[in-house]
Amino acid sequence: MRNFSDILLSQDWQNPHIVKWHCRTPHVPLHSYRTEQEARLDVGGNRQSLNGQWRFALFEKPEAVEPAVIDPDFDDSAWAHIPVPSNWQMQGFDKPIYTNIQYPFADRPPYVPQDNPTGCYRHRFTLEKQALTESIRIVFDGVNSAFHLWCNGHWVGYSQDSRLPAEFELTPYLQEGENLLVAMVLRWSDGSYLEDQDMWWLSGIFRDVYLYRKPILAIEDFFIRTELDALYQHAELRVETRLSQVTRHHQVQVALFDAQGECVARSQALHTGQRVVDEKGAWHDKTEHSLAICSPTLWSDEAPYLYRCVICLLDEDGAPIEFESAAVGFRKVEITQGLLKLNGQPLLIRGVNRHEHHPELGHVMDEASMRRDIELMKQHNFNAVRTAHYPNHPRWYELCDEYGLYVVDEANLETHGQFPMSRLSNDPQWVNAYLQRMIGMVERDKNHPCVIIWSLGNESGIGTNHHAMYQWTKQRDPSRPVQYEGGGANTAATDIVCPMYARVDQHQPHPAVPKYALKNWISLPQENRPLILCEYAHAMGNSLGAFYKYWQAFREFPRLQGGFIWDWVDQGISKWDSEGRHYWGYGGDFGDTINDRQFCINGLLFPDRTPHPALHEVKKVQQPYQFSLSYPKLTIHNERLFAALPLELVVSVLCDGQEIKQERLPLDIAPRGTITLDLASLPMLPEHEYHLNAVLLCREDQPWSNAGHCIASEQWCLQPRRSMLPKITHAPLPQWQQDGDKVRIEAANQQWQFNRQTGLLEQWWQNGQPVLSEPLRDNFYRAVLDNDIGTSEAQHLDPNSWIARWHAAGLDKLRVECDDLRVTTLNESVEVVIDVAHYHQQALALRTRWRYQIFGDARVELNVEVMLCSDLPPLPRVGLTLALPVAENPVSWFGRGPHENYPDRLQSAHVGRYTATVDELHTPYIFPSENGLRCDTRQLQVGALVVEGHFHFSLSRYSQTMLDKAKHSNELVAGDKWYLNLDAQHMGVGGDDSWSQSVHPEFLLTQPHYQYQLTLRVKASSPQ
């Protein structure tokens, strides 16, 4: 046995050749049921959870640990209690560190820092004498990053790879009654060089720990395969079982049960060694069963029907010793004709990358959180998930089997911080570490029907070690494709071309790893593989512009079979400031000086699983039903491949945003089917705007939603709004007067005051009450988005980023001068024309001309012209901004909504009439930025102020300046005014990625001249 000092001297955690000591061979999760009924129902078994409160102490390095901590008599009463599972940084020990690419320590593989925080855990448990007659194993489902284990003072073994089980045989070290476990967990190990995965660096025993008992001769592993015939009608169930010892006398029997618990098939009991494999004979610790299954119900994401396979080990007399079982889904994954297919049908992957993240627990995932994630995915039309970038909690796969979600299962491997990235991937010293990460994942997860693709890892370049992983995997499991993006996404180590952030129509040249436009990639010579983006549509902050273009391409080109959005959830950690205000922390907020700021904040959901507005866009764009309208004929095509959903169709007609007619009818559309309906036509008055809405609802409850859930929708404009003749007013002509620099106009109990020096409408009164809190001003800037910042740092702006170009042009700090203000009395109005010049330093940047026409009924017609006078970059926005007193009534508008939308992200935002509070109009992005826009607005009412025209608006308690300065949401402090932005044009948000200029050309504001018109009025009283 190794003593403590030997372990410290050996430094196993800095030796790439050593990844395990005394760990059991990887295998599927085992339960050792003792009856067939237990195995069939997946209840009982012989597991004993060790989760709970353990004693814990943190040391600055392993050498600082007292050798006596492993002794049963050591007094740990002064140690803290810590929950297992947990990350110790989330329990107040040490600090979380976030980096994207760079290692948070000196890059000298395999060596790690001498100051290496080391957590020591002690836990006592009891065993009865009867338990000691069997083999007792302990399983740690996840420990970061490496650990040594002792039991009752005896060294048991060592393990690294934080995302796979470490299993040890404890039997030799156990005793009747009380037993002691001691785990010494190191924050850093040579394995950390392989786990550089754009996430928080957190440590500890963060997944379940349990004991389980097995007979001395027992079922050690089993591999279930389902093979379908050429017509996908009948199947063969193949089960390979491995025992813990060689035996010629024991037998194995296999039975299959359907979802109702009825036995579908039962095999004969077979001895080991039935098939000779080479000149030395057969495997006498293995059996191979084959059962013919007639017309099984097939498994898919749409109809995840599960059987249960029960495996029984029989003794020499035919009596059962133990049982193991697993869920079985009959399905066939294959690549034929350049297409990834399931059960013969080409898949369209509606996928997302998901990190395991909890805002209070770190990397600890409970079942409720996992179920919530899956239900949200299904509700938003996802059918696939990539376990970015490591094997997930074992329960995750069971839930994906159950709910129906395709999984790309990814090895715990990323060396993004290496130079070059492939350095370790080509080093034979590391080949075993690479292989063991792949082997452990495949062996653990091989029986899950949800796993349709294996992944070799992420962002590690390409090297000989990857090819070894690929070859082993294809030999072990030929039934699934293997993918890997590294080295250019189309190497010999991938069955699927799986690029990240390739664009639909734009090549991204690179001397080593070019990214071709998607439409061109699939037409390259000799390239006949399917293309599925392993990452695309970088959802960082206010993002996902032009997402719909990807889906236009996916639907047009069959070999473009979808992709996985980056990513699912913002990796923010809950924090509270000194005033007790909650906010989400990111890199640098915990004293982590090496960090990548908010680059961990790029999810479709906030950390608490509240959806971002962009999630609505994703749901709409990838919805599995497609609509077309040739009024009054409505055609609906079902993109689902395997199972029809009972639906209810709701068709409504809107006149000027108000629903005037609705029809509802039950609907059933066969998979891949199309139906056409005749709608009742409706007479339309020429002076009104009409829209048709079609919404498909789930008619019945689903495992992932209630009846009434909207699964798809579409809107068409039946008749656009027509230009109206100028309104004729019969009210008395407004009166105006000048007093020094002030020009005051009066009409209908309202007054307007202009300042000749500034050119501003300083105030507007109604019955003596001020309408404005701040004047109307030109607005050409926005609080920068993450996509505007790109790769910029606080002290160094990326010169190609939008923020750098806008700041260089002075758009955030233009000096404004009024050149002229003229007042003219017209037939029905008083006209005020103001010429304004905008300077950056001494250079003229823009000119604007504001033309107010104030009518006798107190209506204000505003016309603004914008003329660019210098070589400016595309503008963030063209419009005006003002501030209003806080109002009590909800805001109402006629335009796109109800959620936030932008010119390149509005497919999901239908035109209608909506109401919301000012807080509901604000999107609290973790890194504050421009937010809350509602596009194509015809009418807006805020308090008593009514705005009409065609514009985009946002209303917030916070100004653009406040948003631009804040780094966290708690830094935003509301005052006594609301800030209203009225935009004629607004640049897109982009989102193909977040580090280059990703706004598509048609969503850039590049014209030299803009003009817009608005009508403003104040209602006599606010609506009830």
Swiss-Prot record:
Annotated residues for binding of Mg(2+) 2: N595
Residue sites binding Na(+) per the record: D198, F599, N602
Top-rank taxon, per record: Bacteria
Catalysis: reaction(s): Hydrolysis of terminal non-reducing beta-D-galactose residues in beta-D-galactosides
Cofactor(s), by name: Mg(2+); Na(+)
GO MF annotation terms: beta-galactosidase activity; carbohydrate binding; magnesium ion binding
UniProt entry tagged with the keyword Hydrolase: yes
Gene Ontology BP term (one): lactose catabolic process
Top-level enzyme category: hydrolase
Xref: Pfam families: Bgal_small_N, Glyco_hydro_2, Glyco_hydro_2_C, Glyco_hydro_2_N, LacZ_4
Binding site for substrate: N100, D198, E459, E535, Y536, A537, H538, N602, W995
GO cellular component terms given for this protein: beta-galactosidase complex
Active site: E459, E535
Protein EC: 3.2.1.23
Key words, A-Z: Glycosidase, Hydrolase, Magnesium, Metal-binding, Sodium
List of residues binding Mg(2+) 1: E414, H416, E459
Cofactor note: Binds 2 magnesium ions per monomer. Binds 1 sodium ion per monomer.
Site note Transition state stabilizer, residues: H355, H389
Gene3D superfamilies reported in the protein's UniProt record: 2.70.98.10, Galactose-binding domain-like, Glycosidases, Immunoglobulins
Family: Belongs to the glycosyl hydrolase 2 family.
UniProt xrefs under PANTHER family: BETA-GALACTOSIDASE
Oligomeric form and interacting partners: Homotetramer.
Name of this protein: Beta-galactosidase
